[in-house]
Structures are given as C-alpha cells and as structure tokens.
C-alpha cells in the first residue's frame, strides 16, 4: 500500500492485480455481469490488505502430530456494513474472505445538493466489534462521512472503524479527512477530480447503475 502526503488517513492499495481489474471496471463497454464480478474480486483482494492488522490471539489445537498454540483472530466477529446500494457489491467480496462476519446496512442517497439522506440503518451489536464500511465511490465524501457518523453516534470508537472504496476524488477525501481524521480510508485509486455533476474523473461512472444494470 502507498500513501498520499496530503491525506494522512488515506491508504491506496496499488497491487498490480487490483489495478488491472480496476482498469476493466472503468471501461464503459464492460458488461454488468463482468462489472459485478470484478467488483467482488477487487474487494476480496483489498480485504486481504486492510485486515492485515487485525488483533491476534492463540488457540490450542491438536494437529495430527502434536498440540500447538496457533494464531486466530481475537475478539468478536467482524462486521461488514455496505452503504446502499452500490456497497452491496463489495460486501460479497469481503464475505468471501471472512464468511463468519456479521453484516449490517446503511441506506443513504444523495439529494439534489449532493448531501446524504439516510433511509435505513440496520447494524449488529456494536460493543467491541471492528466495522468495515464499504462503498465503491468516495466522490463528494458526504455519504462516507455520514456512514462513519452513524457508527460514532453509537459509540463505536474510531479505532474500530475502517472505510473501503474503489475510487475516490481528492475533494471527497479531504471532506472525509476533515470530518474523521481518526478513521482509515482504503481505496484502490485516488482519481483526478470531481466534474460539475460531482462525478469522479476518470472514475467508472455510476457504480450502482453499472452494478445492477439500471439507468440513473
């Protein structure tokens, strides 16, 4: 992973496989089915990177040869929380990696002024649990900020929250960092800028529409 000196809490997963698959996702001619499969695959690969610092303890197990104290992840099961609707496509990849994880949902849509409007919150029990929030895009950053706000208002500590996205605009990352400098943001690409319609450039279009085969 690499970092950008402008954004201390931003981590960019620049693995060649991730970048290769992301290029195919950007292609406007990529089919809905392939887009969906690539999103799942990239998220799984990113999940490997973002979970590398999970707390570890040991468990006594019997191998065919000997008893040994072997490493296992400590604490409660992870919680994966997609930001609806496009985040659903990322939760599948994370569940492939951590099938025992709990799953919550935060439903947010963008109003005409690009501010988030919340319509759904369903979460597992919060105490002592690590949360991975996921949404393919961090454009204006407002939805990502709102999703973290939902957890913090329920007393989830910042150290137990991670946000993962495919692509982000610098404007959105700045908004996220200003609001939550204590929460790590993981992306596959920091793109150039937002256009006049608040779309990421070069981006990959509307992730939700491309994922579900709908039109905005």
Curated annotation (Swiss-Prot):
Q: Where does the chain bind 5-phospho-alpha-D-ribose 1-diphosphate?
A: 85, 110, 135-143, 206
Can you supply a Gene Ontology BP term from the record?
Answer: uracil salvage
Q: Does the keyword ATP-binding apply?
A: no
Q: Does the keyword Mitochondrion apply?
A: no
MF terms per GO, please?
GTP binding; magnesium ion binding; uracil phosphoribosyltransferase activity
InterPro entries, from UniProt? PRibTrfase_dom (IPR000836), PRTase-like (IPR029057), Upp_B (IPR034332), UPRTase/APRTase (IPR050054), Ura_phspho_trans (IPR005765)
The prosthetic group or cofactor this protein requires is: Mg(2+)
Which keywords appear in this protein's UniProt record, sorted alphabetically? Allosteric enzyme, Glycosyltransferase, GTP-binding, Magnesium, Nucleotide-binding, Transferase
Q: Report the cofactor remark.
A: Binds 1 Mg(2+) ion per subunit. The magnesium is bound as Mg-PRPP.
Pathway info:
Pyrimidine metabolism; UMP biosynthesis via salvage pathway; UMP from uracil: step 1/1
Source domain of life: Bacteria
How activity is controlled: the entry says: Allosterically activated by GTP.
Please give the catalytic activity noted in the UniProt record. UMP + diphosphate = 5-phospho-alpha-D-ribose 1-diphosphate + uracil
Q: Which Pfam families match?
A: UPRTase (PF14681)
**Amino acids binding uracil:** 200, 205-207
**Which EC numbers characterise this protein's activity in its record?**
2.4.2.9
Annotated SUPFAM superfamilies: PRTase-like
| Assigned protein family | Belongs to the UPRTase family.
Task: Tell me, in a sentence or two, what this protein's role is.
Answer: Catalyzes the conversion of uracil and 5-phospho-alpha-D-ribose 1-diphosphate (PRPP) to UMP and diphosphate.
For this entry, the protein name equals Uracil phosphoribosyltransferase
């Amino acid at each position: 992973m690499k970092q950008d000196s402008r954004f201390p809490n931003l981590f960019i997963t620049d693995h060649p496989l991730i970048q290769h698959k992301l290029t195919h996702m950007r292609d406007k001619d990529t089919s809905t089915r392939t887009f969906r499969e690539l999103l799942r695959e990239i998220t799984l690969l990113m999940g490997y990177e973002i979970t590398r610092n999970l707390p570890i303890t040991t468990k006594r197990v019997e191998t065919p040869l000997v008893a040994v104290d072997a490493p296992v992840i400590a604490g409660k099961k992870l919680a994966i929380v997609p930001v609806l609707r496009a985040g659903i496509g990322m939760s599948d990849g994370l569940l492939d990696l951590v099938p025992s994880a709990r799953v919550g949902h935060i439903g947010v849509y963008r109003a005409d002024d690009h501010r988030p409007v919340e319509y759904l919150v369903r979460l597992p029990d919060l105490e002592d649990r690590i949360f991975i929030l996921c949404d393919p895009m961090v454009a204006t950053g407002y939805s990502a900020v709102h999703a973290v706000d939902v957890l913090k208002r329920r007393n989830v500590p910042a150290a137990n929250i991670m946000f993962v996205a495919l692509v982000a605009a610098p404007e959105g990352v700045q908004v996220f960092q200003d609001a939550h400098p204590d929460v790590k943001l993981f992306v596959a690409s920091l793109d150039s800028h937002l256009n006049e319609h608040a779309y990421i450039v070069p981006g990959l279009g509307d992730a939700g529409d491309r994922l579900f085969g709908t039109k905005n």
